[in-house]
């Protein structure tokens, strides 16, 4: 591991609703902006991680960032699933009707998540379009 800290920091911990919402809003904005693609050149995710890290005690920064990253992946997966459900032929990079994402809410995504070891996974998801 490049940090020299092993993987013990890869554990789930509580992350404030404020930062989960900031990450959700960013994922949604960038999902729309990039038509479902992830663009490492334009993303603002690092700013959210940095702000989060500065808001918590030093001993919680690594595990909190790990957890926030788990949420980020699940938010993106839910948006992908919603667009695919409405348009089965859609592929990332193609334009889509952004109103599809109006029904994807952070709370509804989080209500489907369960802990699986040190990861958050979807138990099930119901996307109404």
What label would you give each PLM region?
Residues 1-129:
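Type III/flagellar secretion export determinants
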């Amino acid at each position: 591991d490049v940090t020299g800290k092993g993987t013990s920091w890869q554990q789930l911990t509580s992350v404030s609703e404020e930062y989960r919402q900031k990450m959700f809003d960013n994922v949604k904005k960038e999902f729309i902006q990039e038509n479902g693609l992830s663009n490492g050149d334009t993303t603002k995710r690092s700013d959210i991680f940095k702000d989060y890290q500065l808001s918590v005690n030093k001993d919680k920064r690594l595990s909190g960032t790990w957890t926030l990253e788990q949420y980020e992946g699940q938010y993106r997966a839910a948006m992908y699933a919603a667009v695919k459900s409405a348009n089965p032929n859609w592929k990332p990079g193609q334009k889509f009707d952004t109103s599809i994402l109006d029904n994807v809410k952070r709370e509804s995504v989080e209500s489907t998540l369960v802990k699986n070891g040190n990861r958050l996974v979807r138990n099930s998801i119901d996307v109404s379009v």
